[in-house]
Amino acid sequence: MTNTPAPKSSYSRRWAWDGRAPLRGFFNAALRLIFRVTTRFEVIGREHVPATEGFIVMINHIHALDPLVVIPSLGRSVTPMPKVEAFESLAIRFFIINYGCIPVHRGDVDTQAIRLATDTLKSGGAVLIAPEGTRSKTGGLIAGQEGMAFIATRADALILPVAIQGTPDVFPALKRLRRARVTLTLGEAFRMDTGGGRASRAMLQHLTDDAMRRMAALLPESMRGVYK
């Protein structure tokens, strides 16, 4: 993370932290139906989802569908954190605002996004973060960035690792009139330990790597990437 403040977006972010997500329930129901019909969908380890406490949903990122598969599937309301560039698409902007998302400026310290995510977690909500910061081109894990660890330690939040498999196969399978197998494997929720002090950047990276290794343990070896 750099120390350069992120420029303010002209788009409203209020929906993510004040509870104004008018179509979240509708979108979740629609997404569940779509994936039930178009894929062979399975969630393993649903018992690991925290019942009431705020938590971070940590995902590996292998396809644009990843957040859409995860957010309706955990039995808890989850706030995604998409890149702010997604607002440039009118349709995606409609979804982001009405679902209730926290847009993030990538590459800089986005203090507003950090504050909104922290507030959401402290109020008992859940946010979805891909610590890799971008999609993996190979399907294997790439090095995690410390932004998730910064938010997790600031909010003292639980982290639920969710390993995604199969999303890149969805559209190719549909073209052949088949349904791809899509699997979410949930690990045990954990909390990052800073030893009671403020985490340095080196410690944040260490905590990030530890979290990514937990993610790797939920994936087949071929998808563990730099965390084999």
Predicted regions, residues:
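A short beta-turn/loop motif at secondary-structure boundaries
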Residues: 47-50, 176-177
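Short gly/ser/thr-rich secondary-structure transition/capping motifs
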Residues: 36-44, 165-168
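Catalytic core of membrane glycerolipid acyltransferases/transacylases, capturing the structured
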Residues: 28-29, 36, 49-108, 116
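A conditional alpha-helix N-cap/helix-loop micro-motif detector
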Residues: 39, 107-110, 141
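Conserved beta-strand scaffold positions in the cores of enzyme catalytic domains, especially
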Residues: 43, 80, 101-103, 159-161, ...
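Non-catalytic C-terminal accessory region of glycerolipid acyltransferases
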Residues: 2-23, 112-228
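Generic beta-structure capping elements
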Residues: 46, 60, 83, 107, ...
